[in-house]
Regions:
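Generic low-complexity, intrinsically disordered sequence content enriched
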Residues: 5-7, 23, 36, 113, ...
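N-terminal Sec-pathway targeting helices
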Residues: 1-24
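Extracytoplasmic electrostatic interaction patches
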Residues: 65-179
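N-terminal export/targeting and maturation segments
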Residues: 16, 21-105
Length: 179
């Protein structure tokens, strides 16, 4: 009889610990994703712009509707600036087993970046061909255009200070991308 009571107490404690850990993990995950652009802005990265762009499209929420922008979060995550007709997307690469970023420009040029936002290839959809020499393209200028095209969302997200600051966890989780 005493043994059963001890076992019940132990099971209750284990359940409480599991619930507490699940709650902490859930709150932390929502905090990190919801404030990822803020954390990127305040990270020790030497290039916060690229990190902010990556976090914006990776962690966009369906409820993040803003005037002048439309969102797609089923499958590949995509943000469209409807006034400039440009798209920023994050999803599974068709050419390899990695994820990639894509910036689709209204002139028919599609820029594809790797998981660290380094330019991989350029596709001209009007001519149905890939550019062979991407070294002649000013990658920094393209990234600056992306930042400017999505600046209203980025600026708002940069200023959205989290309730609980988990900057150190963000820096640890994204340490490979913070350079």
């Amino acid at each position: 009889m005493v043994l059963r009571k001890e076992i019940r107490k132990m099971i209750k404690k284990i359940i409480m610990v599991i619930l507490a850990l699940a709650t902490i993990w859930f709150i932390g995950d929502i905090n990190l994703k919801g404030s990822s652009v803020y954390y990127a802005k305040h990270s020790p990265s030497s290039n916060t712009r690229d990190l902010e762009i990556m976090m914006l499209v990776e962690n966009i929420q369906a409820s993040a509707d803003r005037e002048g922008f439309s969102y797609e979060v089923d499958g590949d995550k995509t943000i469209q600036n409807t006034t400039k007709n440009v798209y920023l997307s994050y999803g599974h690469s068709v050419n390899d087993d990695n994820y990639e970023y894509a910036y689709m420009y209204e002139n028919g040029l599609d820029y594809y970046f790797d998981n660290f936002l380094k330019l991989k290839r350029i596709y001209n959809s009007k001519e149905a061909r890939y550019y062979k020499d991407i070294l002649t393209v000013d990658e920094n200028k393209i990234k600056e255009e992306i930042y400017e095209d999505f600046k209203p969302i980025l600026k708002e997200s940069e200023e959205n200070k989290p309730f609980i600051n988990l900057q150190w966890i963000f820096n640890w989780v994204y340490r490979d991308r913070i350079k």
